[in-house]
Amino acid sequence: MTTQKTVLITGFEPFGKETINPSWEAAKQLQGRELCGARVEARQLPCVFDVSLACLYAAIDDVQPDLVIAVGQAGGRPNITVERVAININDASIPDNQGNQPINTPIVATGPAAYFATLPINAIVKGLRDAGVPASISQTAGTFVCNHVMYGLLHHLACIYPEIRGGVLHIPYLPEQAARYSGTPSMALETVITALEIAIDEALKNSEDIANNGDTAH
């Protein structure tokens, strides 16, 4: 009997001056769904250094997923961006939700300088574009909690769960957020949900990534 695959998708609580976070607004819509034969489990992460990783690790232990996709908000970006790499540095320009603001500190003191996503990032971008969803590969996840979570996730998987693949997708503001900032791009929630469905589908279908699709980095 074949065991059904499971996907863990996470989104963040609101941070900064925002009252919503599109990453969680979208991710929670996938809770309990079946996509490409896999069951989706959604979990919310706090926008807090270290605590976010403790919550993520607990979720991985609980769900025992085949795939982990962490989703974050990238206000100002116009499209879905699939992160290529996470670096071993915390360098926060604003405090997290508990007032922590680490500057130039390592995420894992003995860890490598960086980890590459183990998701098929080119396949995901191509799948999104083929469906009419604007998407690109990003070469930086920043140095705030999203990068912290991506690095911590990939370090945890490499050390404890090497069979699990994972990575991070950044999504734009929702229209109701962007309306407060003149000229800021946004993406409808329904489009973001579709994008996450496609990302999961492509990741499950492609155990190996496709050739570079000519994406322009952002």
UniProtKB/Swiss-Prot annotation:
Its EC number is 3.4.19.3. Gene3D superfamilies: Peptidase C15, pyroglutamyl peptidase I-like (3.40.630.20). InterPro entries: Peptidase_C15, Peptidase_C15-like, Peptidase_C15-like_sf, PGP-I_bact-type, PGPEP1_Cys_AS, PGPEP1_Glu_AS. Disulfide bonds: none annotated. It catalyses: Release of an N-terminal pyroglutamyl group from a polypeptide, the second amino acid generally not being Pro. One of its GO terms (molecular function) is pyroglutamyl-peptidase activity. GO terms for cellular component: cytosol. It holds the Pfam family Peptidase_C15. Keywords: Cytoplasm, Hydrolase, Protease, Thiol protease. One of its GO terms (biological process) is proteolysis. The active site is at E83, C146, H170. It is found in: Cytoplasm. It is an enzyme of class 3 (hydrolase). Signal peptide: none annotated. Its main location: cytoplasm. PROSITE patterns: PYRASE_CYS, PYRASE_GLU. Removes 5-oxoproline from various penultimate amino acid residues except L-proline. PANTHER family: PROTEASE FAMILY C15 PYROGLUTAMYL-PEPTIDASE I-RELATED, PYROGLUTAMYL-PEPTIDASE I. Homotetramer. Belongs to the peptidase C15 family. This is Pyrrolidone-carboxylate peptidase 2. The lineage of its organism: Bacteria, Pseudomonadati, Pseudomonadota, Gammaproteobacteria, Enterobacterales.
